[in-house]
A protein has these predicted regions:
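Charged, low-complexity interaction regions
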Residues: 17-20, 39-45
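N-terminal alpha-helical modules
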Residues: 19-22, 27-29, 68
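Short amphipathic alpha-helical segments that mediate assembly, nucleic-acid/protein binding
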Residues: 4-7, 23-25, 35, 54, ...
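A short, structured beta-strand/loop element
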Residues: 29-34, 41
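Short, flexible helical or helix-coil boundary motifs
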Residues: 14, 33-37, 64, 84, ...
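Amphipathic alpha-helical packing elements
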Residues: 44-79
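Membrane-interface alpha-helices
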Residues: 75-89
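Long, charged low-complexity interaction segments
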Residues: 1-17
Length: 90
């Protein structure tokens, strides 16, 4: 698990302005995107590199600043779409 100091370090290297999302959102993203590391050798693309992992999180946050928000981010949107698709099938 990465911590706030890791997020601050990465954000400084990547010159992130934090005008559309917070450092906490960024940290949440880094920790979620660590799934692309050595946790699974078949899907390891970052090799647990903080900066590469941070770039993945940053890419998602740049296109959708609420991407990692648990209340209304991507996960909730996916659940909404799944419900809609299930209703269409029935």
């Amino acid at each position: 698990m990465y911590n706030i100091n890791d997020a601050i370090y990465a954000s400084r290297l990547l010159n992130i302005p934090f005008n559309k999302f917070s450092i906490e959102d960024f940290l949440e993203g880094i920790n979620i995107e660590s799934e692309h590391g050595s946790i699974n050798e078949l899907t390891n693309v970052t090799n647990d590199d903080l900066i590469i992992t941070s770039k993945i999180a940053l890419a998602h946050l740049n296109e959708y600043p609420n991407y990692y928000n648990k209340e209304y981010g991507l996960k909730k949107y996916e659940e909404f779409l799944k419900t809609k698709l299930n209703n269409v099938k029935n």
